[in-house]
């Protein structure tokens, strides 16, 4: 069945905005500008400020939800299904997981390449699968277990590619290892978030845009408040800002004022996450969850291609092998092998059936009344 223009638009929107989301965050990290008080030029290393911006983008999904709801009231058929009452605080635990996992990933993105960052995020299926078995009493198919094992192998190969690659002054080997481990740690937290959402949230038939928006609201408010104590927590040289504190939000705003392109990168990150969530949910509804997974894989390829073209990282053949193994594991876990096996089975049966028909016709060439 051919895709409609609207479906093609949604798929393209998801691919483009998903790629912009990671690339804009990495672009902001690459900027160098003066900070507050005439401090020397330094890199824009403000992961928690970036995380606040991302949650602001998620929070804006609430606006999209209410727009759809208002549009549905004007029309006879609403795209927003009626819901049963629910307690908004149900979203607090998954929002805290989202806030923690996202903040860790933004810290990690300062330490490793954008392509490795995107590839290692595939580890989420390992922990989601294990937690689903442990807490949701779900039984995984043998192909899903195999997909998890293959994904682990892919993560090992991607990690080896980072270890064996040459590192510049911006990304030292110790930083890359720490960054990769932080990404894996963040996927454990994101997997807990997914299990919590499935166990406590989705049974209330809540619209996904509303769910993302409420989680974005909690994340934005809580993390914005946490920026105050972070301004005073010393972390020595780990933070990368002149004051050596966990997060210096004032320094971030000063750098944005002195280098306006940082504001453009942050705006790209905020707006892209909103459109990415909307298009991802719409792709699942209009097409399928499998299509969404395939587009997410294509997003990794786009990010990788752009970072290579822009000179942000160097090409390493071992990374291709790791990506292909990860792709195979993800495909198996999500059941992408089933349509392929069904297609091959049909192709195999067709020649066999044609051969049987030829044999039957060949055997029946002599009329029955002449057989005696």
Curated annotation (Swiss-Prot):
Glycans are attached at residue 110. GO terms for biological process: negative regulation of mitochondrial outer membrane permeabilization involved in apoptotic signaling pathway; positive regulation of cell population proliferation. The modification Phosphothreonine is found at residue 366. Its main location: mitochondrion. Keywords: Glycoprotein, Lysosome, Membrane, Mitochondrion, Phosphoprotein, Signal, Transmembrane, Transmembrane helix, Transport. Residues 105-160 form the EamA domain. The chain crosses the membrane at residues 48-68, 89-109, 116-136, 145-165, 176-196, 211-231, 261-281, 293-312, 320-336. InterPro entries: SLC35_F1/F2/F6, UCP036436. GO terms for cellular component: cytosol; lysosomal membrane; lysosome; mitochondrion; nucleoplasm. It is a multi-pass membrane protein. GO terms for molecular function: transmembrane transporter activity. Interacts with SLC25A5. This is Solute carrier family 35 member F6.
